């Protein structure tokens, strides 16, 4: 049976989504998802409550509600709904208050809002995103000394999404460089990359998966053929081994998992933004 799931917040609803998805992933559910950010007024909260109640009346099954709301009056309206309501923050606040010995001082938008205390971190993240976009897919090999990581791999193995995730989530300046079909006859590591060997990290992928991804882009082409994909993967993995470049098979991993594994292998600190 499908369950309706609400992620509600007086801010971006990112926290409610992250926690809610993490919990829901433990169960084999089919879900209809509703994300409702910036529920800051009692009027908006009552409208949301009616939406939850209407879905309950239609299905006879309580919607699941993950919420994070600072204002008590607004929070209470959501809690009065017919949904199964779970405050994703308050469950931890009580025990933490006892441990710290101080009372919480909740402020709306503190987690993901822009404040004087996190402005420098925000600027660093924007700088990282700009750098990563300017050094995507081998566009530029200049200023690689400013890169914190340089991802290598064949076309369509996950370099670009991983680079952007590292920049957006952790403020890491990530460049990436592709090895294309024309490189394979005499594959070697460009001199500009050799100078930054400690920053290099390779991504590889199962040939069958690579062929399927490429076929969506250019079907029935040499580029997407299984034979071509196998050859490219073999050549690039050999290059990684010969140059002592650490690498990861991305086939069965999400972008989040790939990024976390890379940072762990390279010993990079995880600074959340």
UniProtKB/Swiss-Prot annotation:
The keyword Kinase applies. Transmembrane segments: none annotated. GO terms for molecular function: ADP binding; ATP binding; phosphotransferase activity, phosphate group as acceptor; protein serine/threonine kinase activity. It catalyses: [pyruvate, water dikinase] + ADP = [pyruvate, water dikinase]-phosphate + AMP + H(+); [pyruvate, water dikinase]-phosphate + phosphate + H(+) = [pyruvate, water dikinase] + diphosphate. InterPro entries: Kinase-pyrophosphorylase, PSRP. Belongs to the pyruvate, phosphate/water dikinase regulatory protein family. PSRP subfamily. It comes from Sodalis glossinidius (strain morsitans). Its EC number is 2.7.11.33, 2.7.4.28. It holds the Pfam family Kinase-PPPase. This is Putative phosphoenolpyruvate synthase regulatory protein. HAMAP family: PSRP. Keywords: Kinase, Nucleotide-binding, Serine/threonine-protein kinase, Transferase. It comes from the Bacteria.
